[in-house]
UniProtKB/Swiss-Prot annotation:
SUPFAM superfamilies: HD-domain/PDEase-like (SSF109604). One of its GO terms (molecular function) is 5'-deoxynucleotidase activity. The keyword tRNA-binding does not apply. Keywords: Cytoplasm, Hydrolase, Metal-binding, Nucleotide-binding. It comes from Yersinia enterocolitica serotype O:8 / biotype 1B (strain NCTC 13174 / 8081). This is 5'-deoxynucleotidase YE1340. PROSITE patterns: HD. The lineage of its organism: Bacteria, Pseudomonadati, Pseudomonadota, Gammaproteobacteria, Enterobacterales. Its cofactor is a divalent metal cation. GO terms for cellular component: cytoplasm.
Length: 197
């Protein structure tokens, strides 16, 4: 018997942004799906508009599993995780152990197929960068949603994430920011009006 998917199903029980007041709580499972949507889009944008040659389907899968180890480690708040290089390095080692534990839960004949999704060492540098871009973009989108709902708790997180996005800047991310991100600050009525015309 394998407990792999029973563990993954518990990602929905792990809340993100645990030290901040949230208008709407976000869990790791739904965050992972949004990161998969965005990473897939970034890969397609890169391929179509900027001469990329990425496997967008694989990128979506990598993004889907990018936080899977948090079912074992929990979601450590970013300011703690990256407080200094030593803590960040040690936390990476903890994540690696958690990834390995998850892989070992699988039947042996399936381990290789999932190892290349769960273990970042199997990602190309380009794949890794794109998933990290999508992850940061989704955190930024969460900030926009919270701020548009009147929650000023996310002001500093938004500023921090703008710096992160600037460091990870790419043509495909610029395109996504210009074409898709403005809608995240609008109400349902505002985004529905355009689609009904």
């Amino acid at each position: 018997m394998s407990h792999f998917f029973a563990h993954l199903s518990r990602l929905k029980l792990i809340n993100r942004w645990p030290l901040m007041r949230n208008v709407r709580t976000e869990n790791v499972s739904e965050h992972s799906l949004q990161v998969a949507f965005v990473a897939h889009a970034l890969a397609i944008i890169k391929n179509r508009k900027f001469n990329g040659n990425l496997n967008a389907d694989r990128i979506a899968l990598l993004a889907m599993y990018h936080d899977a180890s948090e079912v074992i480690t929990g979601d450590l708040p970013t300011p703690i995780k990256y407080y200094n290089p030593q803590i960040a390095h040690e936390y990476k080692k903890i994540e690696k152990v958690a990834q390995q534990k998850l892989i070992e839960m699988l039947p042996e004949e399936l381990q290789h197929d999932f190892r290349c999704l769960l273990d970042e060492h199997y990602y190309s540098e380009e794949e890794k960068a794109l998933v990290k871009q999508a992850d940061a973009l989704c955190a930024y989108l969460k900030c926009l949603e919270e701020l548009s709902a009147g929650n000023n708790e996310f002001i500093q997180a938004k500023v921090r994430l703008e710096k992160t996005l600037a460091m990870r800047q790419s043509p495909e991310m610029d395109y996504f920011m210009e074409v898709f991100v403005p809608s995240f600050s609008l109400s349902l009525d505002e985004i529905s009006l355009d689609s009904l015309d």
